[in-house]
Amino acid sequence: EMVDSLILTGSSGLFEESMGNSFPRRGDKDYIRTKTEEVFYDPKVATDELVDKVFAIANNRISVLKLLGYAKSAIRHNMGEDIPNIDKEVCLIWGAEDKVTPPHVAEEFHKLLPKSELNWIPLCGHAAMWEQPKRFSEIVLEFLKK
């Protein structure tokens, strides 16, 4: 009742799997660089400065525990049964080349959310608001004007 509409981008909640041994590998900066680059369509977006920040987070015990908690929660509570009950307008914004939360997840969200619109950003990975901020903002503003 307090929410008029939603904007979701690269969202989790469906199809989460165990992280296995993929995260976090503390102290391995090359691994952190590779994983950071995978977030973007253009790996050059993963600058040395950004990789340093991600590396610091991956080596901060409190941050890692929080991230693992979020990941475990997403694995335990699949939202597939709850999502169709959302009766609000929803703007889905997805990077067309998202490897973290692939396009088929966007399609499933769109199918399950009765009042959703799905917006693709081409040549864009998981962090659409970062990699394509102008187009991302245009989509958000168009949605908010409705």
Feature names for model-found ranges:
Residues 86, 92-94, 98:
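Short beta-strand/loop motif that positions the catalytic acidic residue
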Residues 3-4, 87-88, 114-115, 146:
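Active-site acidic short loop of glycosyltransferases
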Residues 62, 101-104, 131:
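Residue-level signal for the nucleotide or nucleotide-sugar donor/cofactor binding architecture
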Residues 26-88:
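Conserved alpha/beta-hydrolase catalytic His-Asp/Glu region
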Residues 2-33:
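Flexible "cap/lid" loop of the alpha/beta hydrolase fold
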Residues 116-146:
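Catalytic active-site module of serine/aspartate enzymes centered on a nucleophile-bearing elbow/loop
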Residues 88, 102-111:
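Short alpha-helix in the alpha/beta-hydrolase fold that links the catalytic acid
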Residues 35, 71, 109, 136, ...:
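Hydrophobic "lid"/C-terminal helical patch
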